Amino acid sequence: MRKADIVRETKETRVALTVDLDGTGRSAISTGIGFLDHMLDLLARHARFDLEIKADGDLHVDFHHTTEDVGIVLGQALKKALGDMRGITRYADVLLPMDETLTRVALDISGRPFLVFRTEFAVPKIGEFDTELVREFFQAFASSAGVTLHVETLYGVNAHHIAESCFKGLARVLRAAVAVDPAAAGEIPSTKGALGT
């Protein structure tokens, strides 16, 4: 079973997360940030991960610490659930439309953390959520998961649609890249014989 439970506690936040990579897309998300909950719910749905997150953070300061730390813990959980990554597809990419918006996302579960994020927002906030925190989440996730992740919005107008296309794109590439490749026969998908070393 490809599952992981992580609890991370700092002076700023406490995040408890459970993920099942072979789930059905069920989620129970409570971060105290409505927009982030919405994005994580749709990520679970479209990745087909079962995902539970309970986060308590210093929201009286702002949403930065909670958003970043949820990204960190989700990345840690993905890495733990994948183990030695034997038999996974490893690579995936998608062009994800959301009404007037089109975003391209590409993923390599390589063990080498790197993010390219070419997405711009014309407004500073979506409701109470700072749009710059979308990038912070993706950076935290890529770094802690040890993945190479490229996110590029080719065009778009509505900030909510742009953010949603990024999260749905991440969901779809995760779903494809963690899938077990029957042709791989349990091999580690690397000529080095190991990932992340």
From Swiss-Prot:
InterPro entries: IGPD_sf (IPR038494), ImidazoleglycerolP_deHydtase (IPR000807), ImidazoleglycerP_deHydtase_CS (IPR020565), Ribosomal_Su5_D2-typ_SF (IPR020568). Its EC number is 4.2.1.19. The keyword Cytoplasm applies. NCBIfam families: PRK00951.1-5 (NF002109), PRK00951.2-1 (NF002111), PRK00951.2-4 (NF002114). This is Imidazoleglycerol-phosphate dehydratase. It is found in: Cytoplasm. Keywords: Amino-acid biosynthesis, Cytoplasm, Histidine biosynthesis, Lyase. It comes from Xanthobacter autotrophicus (strain ATCC BAA-1158 / Py2). The keyword Amino-acid biosynthesis applies. GO terms for biological process: L-histidine biosynthetic process. One of its GO terms (cellular component) is cytoplasm. Pfam families: IGPD. The lineage of its organism: Bacteria, Pseudomonadati, Pseudomonadota, Alphaproteobacteria, Hyphomicrobiales. Belongs to the imidazoleglycerol-phosphate dehydratase family. Transmembrane segments: none annotated. HAMAP family: HisB. Gene3D superfamilies: Imidazole glycerol phosphate dehydratase, domain 1. GO terms for molecular function: imidazoleglycerol-phosphate dehydratase activity. It catalyses: D-erythro-1-(imidazol-4-yl)glycerol 3-phosphate = 3-(imidazol-4-yl)-2-oxopropyl phosphate + H2O. Pathway: Amino-acid biosynthesis; L-histidine biosynthesis; L-histidine from 5-phospho-alpha-D-ribose 1-diphosphate: step 6/9.
